[in-house]
Regions:
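Conserved acidic carboxylate
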Residues: 10
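Two-component/phosphorelay signaling modules centered on CheY-like receiver
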Residues: 13-32
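Acidic, metal-coordinating helix/loop segments flanking the phosphotransfer/catalytic sites
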Residues: 20, 32-52
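Conserved phosphotransfer cores of two-component systems
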Residues: 44-48, 71-78, 95
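Conserved phosphotransfer microenvironments
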Residues: 50, 54-70
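Hydrophobic/aromatic residues positioned on beta-strands within the core alpha/beta folds
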Residues: 82-84
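Residues at the ends of beta-strands that form strand-to-helix hinge/output surfaces
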Residues: 103-104
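C-terminal output helix
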Residues: 107-119, 124-129
Length: 131
């Protein structure tokens, strides 16, 4: 099985390391960044290799996680997106991209793995339906 690359954007270093470890233990390759700006740089530079995004909502500087996901969907309309946030969940319906998942902090790592795996599997099922 080929390795799937997830772009992980979280500005709290300890959380970033925890999320990165959990994703790697689940078999994913991880591009970990600490800002929305760095996330966009990776998306634009390596758009074909990123299979999904896990992003915090609020960063110290623009762009926000909402913006990262919207731009990712401009590049790839089916890009799986998991939002992670401590206080932005109420805005998900109005700010989030369609067919995304919101996980509220704090959460157990298995929730993160299940969420991104579900979206990746849904995407693969959609591709298989088209073939």
């Amino acid at each position: 099985m080929e390795s799937v690359t997830i772009l992980l954007a979280e500005d709290e270093t300890l959380l970033l390391l925890d999320f990165e470890d959990a994703l790697k233990e689940a078999g994913f390759m991880v591009l970990a960044v600490t800002s929305g700006k760095k996330a966009l740089e990776h998306l634009k530079a390596a758009e074909s290799s990123i299979a999904g995004i896990v992003t915090d909502i609020r960063f110290a500087e623009s762009p926000s996680g909402w913006d990262v996901a919207r731009i990712a969907r401009e590049i790839d309309p089916e890009m799986p997106v998991v939002y992670i946030s401590g206080d932005s969940a109420p805005d998900w319906a109005s700010q989030g991209v369609p067919k995304s998942i919101m996980i509220e902090k704090p959460f157990v790592m298995s929730q993160l793995i299940v969420a991104i795996s579900q979206l990746l599997n849904d995407r693969r099922a959609g591709v298989a339906d088209l073939e």
